[in-house]
Amino acid sequence: MRLMLYNMRYGTGTGFKFHLPFPFGGFFRKTGKNLDALVRFFREQKADVLGLVEIDSGSYRSSHRNQANYIAWKLGQHPFCRSKYGHRSWWGRLPLMRKQANACLCGQPVLNQRSHFLRKGVKRLVMELELQEVVIFIVHLA
């Protein structure tokens, strides 16, 4: 089984330009130009299970399109996507923040999928995917 974990950084880009016109200004940029390049990269890797952290699940950045669903559709996989912030988190009440998520894409049958939240920290999501021969946990600590 080939497992890949990738930090999408919401598909907004990387490098020095990410910090223009002000530090972390790229965080607010649209993601359309980068998403198809990422899909090509993921296709080349041929991962059976693809964990994605820092994805956009439908804010203005991604033109209100869930990046995990789009990538899964392009790769012929099944998406499991959840907001990074728990139901009681005030971060989850902010429009842009509540669309920040993690995802797991899988081409194999998924027997069970669950979300757990850690007691402490800002990003508390733990995603659990049960496959035929293995259970996978996706966690992005910050």
Regions found by a protein language model. Give the residues of each.
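N-terminal, active-site-proximal structural segment of metallo-dependent hydrolase catalytic domains
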Residues: 1-77, 81-91
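Structured beta-strand-rich core segments of catalytic domains in phosphoester-bond hydrolases
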Residues: 54-142
